[in-house]
Amino acid sequence: MRFKQDRMSSQERMDALFNYRKPDRIPINMITVGFPCRNVGQTVATGYDDPEKYFQAMIWTAEQYGWDLIPEICPHVVLGSVDFGGGFRLPECEFEGALVITSFPVKTEGDIDNLRVPDPKKSGRIGKAMELSKLQEKHGLPVTFVSRSPFSVAANICGLEQFSKWMLKKPELCERLMMIAMDHIFNVLQYWTDTFGADQIFAFMSSPCESNQVISPRQFEKFALPYHVEYHKRLKSLGIKRFWFHICGDQNLNLPALAGASLWPHPSLLSFGHEVDLEEAAKFFPHDIIYGNVEPTVIQMGTPQQVYDLTKIAIEKGKKAPSGFVLSAGCELPPLSPPVNLFAIAKAVNDFGWYE
């Protein structure tokens, strides 16, 4: 089939959204590391271990499927367990889609006493992340700084199961870990800002451990929300103005508190799991760009027609968002997604995603 001719470049399309103007069509963007690598005949591990190959795989895959890489997602810069000395390995079998944690740096209360904020230039896999950021800068893309929320980074340091127990029995330990996580995130972000300048950086945060599948809204407000407030105070002090937030999983019960706190500059890019209705998301955040949220399981396991139909529904809802919409999956695009289902997404945007 022949697709309609774009009337804007990706840069023009995203610039329009961030200036509260309608673009020619709904942009497509994906949170993904493994899929582009598999798409060009490489392993998922390549996405985490070879910045040049990953970058080229993403560029070619984006062109193939009409994705808009303003901004481009990339592997995490800050990793809670790995950065603090935890064990890990690269994904090996076809069903492993990310780094695999083999041990946590904090196993007991006493381990927290010995925990030190890492050197931002040397810890974990930060060197590889810097290589990728320099490739983004070289090719005229925003430099995407990817971290999880302080709550999620802290949970990654000791493991979510242990962190959840401490929330109930020793909440002061969780507070200590979150303060350490916050300092580490911003030490590394300062390194990025010193290297590229605040105007070039697009700060991305995900918050998977804050899902209501894990914690209650009361726990969210007590433990996680204060660190979102502090995060944005520090982000503002660095002069970073572009923010992308993946509110991962089922966080329907957290949305009122997030909306009420009014934390980030507007418009920001707010991504939602498939569990959140896009029209409801737009009601909570009318001044931000809504991003999402075709169910990833259906993209991997469903038929092209099912994916096409779900994408159409997302487009119809997203078009109603007062400050704009970006079409994506509801979380990371599964590495084993059939290529034809990505074509189905592009076809649905071509058929229904234009602003006339």
Regions found by a protein language model. Give the residues of each.
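Active-site loop segments of alpha/beta catalytic cores
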Residues: 1-38, 42-47, 57, 68-72, ...
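Ser/Thr/Asn(+Pro)-rich, low-complexity disordered segments
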Residues: 49-51
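Conserved FAD-binding subdomain of flavin-dependent enzymes
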Residues: 54
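Membrane helical hairpin/interfacial module
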Residues: 58-59, 63-82
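A contiguous, low-structure linker/loop signature
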Residues: 78-118
